[in-house]
């Protein structure tokens, strides 16, 4: 049987920093394989979005705030709406980081 979808619900939850980074590198390597299934990752922490992720869906209270190409979804404005406070987003080497401003 061919797997077409891999759904990971908060896979880095309860991991320390080293464990999280190891997991993300493994997910990045797995997802970069052309034969890998489509991968959906659910997270509340943008730091846990693996490099190479192409699309995102941002929800607040079950409603879509933004969807599409990840760079157009993970923005200061969208995350500020999602979290209800001013957020500054930065990216480095394909990874995202946020902080309250």
Features from the language model and the residues they span:
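H-loop/switch region of ABC-family ATPase nucleotide-binding domains
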Residues: 43-44
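Catalytic Walker B motif of ABC-type/P-loop ATPase nucleotide-binding domains
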Residues: 6-10
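ABC-family nucleotide-binding domains
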Residues: 16
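Helical segment within the ABC ATPase nucleotide-binding domain
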Residues: 20-35
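ABC ATPase "signature
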Residues: 67-68
